[in-house]
Amino acid sequence: MLEPSPYQDHKTWKMTPAMIRARQPFFKKNLMGLVILLGVTGTIYTYTYKMLNKDSDFADVPIPPIDEKELEQLKKEYELEKIRRAQK
């Protein structure tokens, strides 16, 4: 079992006032570091997401027209596949 440090209350495992006082000078700097770290990470993720959404590799490729016979055949194949998957 873990032994409590001298800076922890032995019954509740909470920080003692001495530990709280020792951490006070570093709180603002640590908080600013956290904000900067989260800001940079969030900015990178946002930038990457926006750049990837602009990607339109196939935007210039024309979609060929499909006639009604082919469309009906594709619908039948789709329905048969859907039924086959539902039976599994």
Curated annotation (Swiss-Prot):
Its record classes its membrane topology as: Single-pass membrane protein
Say yes or no: keyword Transmembrane helix present.
yes
Q: Does the keyword Transmembrane apply?
A: yes
Q: Topology: which residues are Mitochondrial intermembrane?
A: 50-88
Which keywords does UniProt give here?
A: Membrane, Mitochondrion, Mitochondrion inner membrane, Transmembrane, Transmembrane helix
User: Got a GO cellular component term for this one?
Assistant: mitochondrial inner membrane
* Ranges annotated as spanning the membrane: 31-49
Q: Where in the cell is it found?
A: Mitochondrion inner membrane
Q: Which residues are exposed on the Mitochondrial matrix face of the membrane?
A: 1-30
Q: Which InterPro entries does the UniProt entry name for this protein?
A: Coa3
**What GO biological process terms are annotated to this protein in UniProt?**
mitochondrial cytochrome c oxidase assembly
Query: How the protein assembles, per its UniProt entry?
Result: Component of 250-400 kDa complexes called cytochrome oxidase assembly intermediates or COA complexes.
Q: What does this protein do?
A: Required for assembly of cytochrome c oxidase (complex IV).
Name the protein family: Belongs to the COA3 family.
Protein name (record): Cytochrome c oxidase assembly factor 3, mitochondrial
Query: Whose protein is this, by species?
Result: Kluyveromyces lactis (strain ATCC 8585 / CBS 2359 / DSM 70799 / NBRC 1267 / NRRL Y-1140 / WM37)
